Amino acid sequence: KKSWPFHNHHVSEEMFLILDGEGILRYGKNNYPLKKNDIIACPTGDRSVAHQIINDSDGDLKYLALGTKNAFDICEYPDSDKILTRGTSENNSELWNISKGKESYDYFEGEE
């Protein structure tokens, strides 16, 4: 059971406190066992700090998730090669864009 895909943030930091249960922290290229009272810090960075909490047990895995709520963030999803770009304005309107791969376009493409 997974709450979100394997990902890393370029702007927002996350921290998790395991309240109850057991599971696995997938972090970078490694897996680490999780148990009650563990604290996990997930800094910003490249795919080497990508992370995911996985409940591989038969019981519940309860945790508290804390994070910085920045107006802008870029998230990478290494397993699917997707990139999420998210921005929030002062009036809380949001713009999300999910793209795949590293395809890029000229600034004026399609604008003529």
Q: What residue ranges belong to the model's regions?
A:
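Conserved short histidine dyad/triad with adjacent acidic residue
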Residues: 1-9
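Short coil/loop residues immediately preceding or within conserved phosphate-binding loops
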Residues: 3, 13, 48
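Short, conserved beta-strand element in jelly-roll/cupin
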Residues: 9-26, 66-68
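Short acidic-glycine-tyrosine-enriched beta hairpin
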Residues: 15, 28-45
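Short hydrophobic/aromatic patches on the structural cores and recognition surfaces of FHA
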Residues: 21, 37, 53
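Short beta-strand His + acidic residue motifs that chelate non-heme Fe in jelly-roll/DSBH
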Residues: 25-26, 42-43, 49-57
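Double-stranded beta-helix
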Residues: 54-112
